[in-house]
Amino acid sequence: MEPTCPFCSSKLEPPRTVVLNVMESVQGGTCGSCGAIYIVDQTGKNLGEVMLQALGLAADRLSKDVSDMVMGEDYEDAVLNYDIRSHRSTGVSKGFMDGQGRLYMVNVKRRV
């Protein structure tokens, strides 16, 4: 099925190139409804790196350092199974030993 945002249930657009800095770019995007950030791990073997990249983008939105961010207070996250070639997902990942790619999503909580 087409991937949907776990935070607002909106359909997600296919990933595009997102420039992180002058030396690094990734495949990802943002949810058109709630603004959640997503980055693709095509192999499912680099999720730690993808998490740090997405949290870096989230920290920039909050003008904070990544090390100062608190899950539940500053952001919430989810990991979806994902096939970038077909732009399909079976939903929230239930394990990491299935050989599928991943879509790591971070929803930045708005400060009041």
Whereabouts are the PLM-identified features?
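Short cysteine-rich clusters marking metal-coordination/redox-active sites
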Residues: 5-9, 31-34
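Cys/His-rich microdomains that often coordinate metals
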Residues: 9-13, 38-39
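Short acidic alpha-helical/loop segments enriched in Asp/Glu that coordinate divalent cations
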Residues: 14-20, 43-46
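Short linker/helix segments within small regulatory modules
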Residues: 18-30
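Short metal-binding segments enriched for Cys and/or His
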Residues: 30-52, 60-69
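Long, contiguous alpha-helical scaffold regions
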Residues: 60-112
